């Protein structure tokens, strides 16, 4: 009889002593015992160390020392993990009751790389649930799934070997989960992702959480991820230049992701951004760049409807002196 699957749960932590006890309690209250709890603290100066010491008998490994941020902490935790299934949860979020038992019941490692369930959002206290109850959605193609920008990371568990092969990109401090998810999709597609209707986590919103205080930084990093995807698809410079407008970081260096899924899976993403770029270049009167983006949209199956024909006439049939 095979051994029961082991879950590794990593908590990256920094000055969240106020919320950490509840996070730890949500894990040790699970009705499945074959798990390990790894806490990587970035040298907290609040009550975090006292909390960790209080729960030390339930913690497999912990360390408190300065690090380079959340992504680095997850990377350090991954080096300590020995489980078959791995996820991280922030030090202010909660694992839902029964989550571990459900995950091992449905996670067939021969069939799946990823299992994702629902995530409830709540404001400050678990008694104050937000209206959102979300699960990562899979669309008909990888490109359409990417356009939805939804992962619900606390409720997304990876097969350990897959997580290790992908790793966590330390360049991202806010969207490391989006980067991880998109790199996975580009390599493996969606066929080995299992969506379950089970509630796996609670995501806390509060006045000092990154989600509440750093929205512009989230968007800037998300723009880098999307740029990397299109860069990896070898899209023309005109489209990449449009994408780079949303990236404020002057030192941004693009990363080429490994792409193994068929081209047709990614056409919805390319044509959607090509059309956005077309509108932008029309507004800025850059006709040559607009033409390039119009071709990209059509090459990626933008439908031959009224919207496309208007743009085609504008750029290929009417003389430029007649255009505004």
Regions found by a protein language model. Name each.
Residues 5-8, 36, 179:
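Cell-envelope/extracellular polymer assembly enzymes that use nucleotide-activated donors
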Residues 86:
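Short aromatic/hydrophobic "clamp" motif used to bind/position activated sugar donors
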Residues 33, 41-50, 90:
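A conserved acidic beta->alpha catalytic loop
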Residues 94, 98-130:
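Conserved donor NDP-sugar-binding/catalytic core segment of glycosyltransferases
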Residues 133-228, 237:
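Conserved nucleotide-sugar donor-binding catalytic segment
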Residues 27, 42-43, 47, 68-69:
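Conserved short acidic donor-positioning loop in nucleotide-sugar-dependent glycosyltransferases
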Residues 65-81:
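Glycine-rich, basic loop-to-helix element that forms the pyrophosphate-binding segment
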Residues 1-28:
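N-proximal low-complexity "stem/linker" segments adjacent to membrane-targeting elements
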């Amino acid at each position: 009889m095979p051994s029961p699957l082991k879950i590794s749960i990593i908590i990256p932590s920094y000055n969240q002593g106020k919320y950490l006890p509840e996070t730890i309690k949500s894990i040790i209250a699970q009705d499945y015992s074959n798990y390990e709890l790894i806490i990587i603290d970035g040298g907290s100066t609040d009550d975090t160390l006292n909390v960790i010491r209080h729960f030390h008998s339930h913690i497999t490994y912990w360390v408190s020392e300065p690090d380079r941020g959340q992504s680095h902490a997850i990377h350090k935790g991954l080096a300590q993990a020995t489980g078959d299934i791995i996820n991280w949860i922030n030090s202010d979020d909660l694992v839902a009751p029964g989550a571990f038992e459900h995950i091992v019941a449905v996670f067939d490692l021969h069939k799946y790389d990823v299992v994702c369930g629902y995530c409830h959002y709540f404001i400050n206290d678990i008694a104050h649930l937000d209206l959102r109850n979300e699960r990562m959605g899979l669309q008909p193609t990888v490109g359409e799934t990417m356009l939805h920008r939804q992962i619900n990371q606390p409720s997304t568990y990876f097969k350990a070997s897959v997580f290790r092969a992908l790793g966590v990109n330390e360049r991202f401090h806010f969207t490391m989960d989006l980067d991880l998810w998109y790199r996975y999709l580009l390599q493996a597609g969606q066929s080995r992702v299992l969506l379950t209707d089970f509630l796996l986590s609670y995501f806390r919103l509060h006045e000092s959480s990154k989600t509440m205080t750093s929205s512009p930084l989230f968007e800037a990093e998300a723009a880098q991820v999307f740029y990397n995807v299109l860069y990896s698809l070898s899209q023309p410079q005109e489209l990449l230049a449009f994408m780079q407008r949303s990236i404020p970081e002057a030192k941004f260096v693009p990363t080429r992701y490994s792409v193994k899924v068929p081209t047709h899976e990614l056409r919805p993403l390319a044509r959607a951004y090509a059309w956005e770029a077309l509108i932008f270049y029309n507004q800025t009167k850059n006709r040559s760049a607009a033409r390039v983006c119009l071709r990209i949209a059509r090459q990626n199956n933008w439908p031959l409807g009224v919207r496309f024909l208007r743009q085609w006439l504008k750029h290929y049939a009417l003389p430029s002196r007649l255009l505004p």
